[in-house]
Amino acid sequence: MIGDLFVTGMVVPELGLAIEETTKTLGVEFTPIQESPLQMRTEKGVEIFNLRFVYSLGRPPHLELIEGIPDGYYDPKGGYIRHVGLWVDDLADASAQLAGSGMPLEASGMNGEVEPYAFVFHALPWGLRVELVDRVQQPTFEAWLGGGELHI
């Protein structure tokens, strides 16, 4: 396996309602809502937006609920499982491995001119998406799950 599975991400039309219903029906507890400015390159070009999301608390793999953004990379279209996420030690190498195995690069995180930065997405034509996340981000992420602030 290229990395360690840690999350399944779902795009939802209304984040607050999704949190409420998931907590009520499944007893899942979530982090506070995180709002994070994000810049990424997609097949449509560079997208810059504020991403709103939560992660389930407890042991991984986590459930990530992402508030949909119409007409963008996270278009809600009724809510769906968006991706599985893997921690990787070498983002560029793992991304090249997926691309070389027939799973093309779909989007990559950016930090100004630095690309890829923090994460990339690869996708198969039938819908499976894999998010590779640089393991350098893991300590910050785990501190956030423990009640700290998330800085991407």
Regions found by a protein language model. Give the residues of each.
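A short, surface-exposed helix-loop junction/capping segment
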Residues: 1-6, 36
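Short, solvent-exposed coil/turn segments
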Residues: 5, 49, 79, 115-117
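Vicinal oxygen chelate
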Residues: 5-13, 55-57, 75-92
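Extracellular/lumenal glycan-associated surfaces
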Residues: 7, 21, 136
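Conserved short beta-strand elements that form part of the metal-binding/catalytic scaffold
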Residues: 29-74, 117-139
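A short, polar/proline- and glycine-enriched secondary-structure boundary/capping micro-motif
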Residues: 73-79, 141-145
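Acidic/histidine-enriched, glycine/proline-rich intrinsically disordered or flexible terminal extensions
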Residues: 134-152
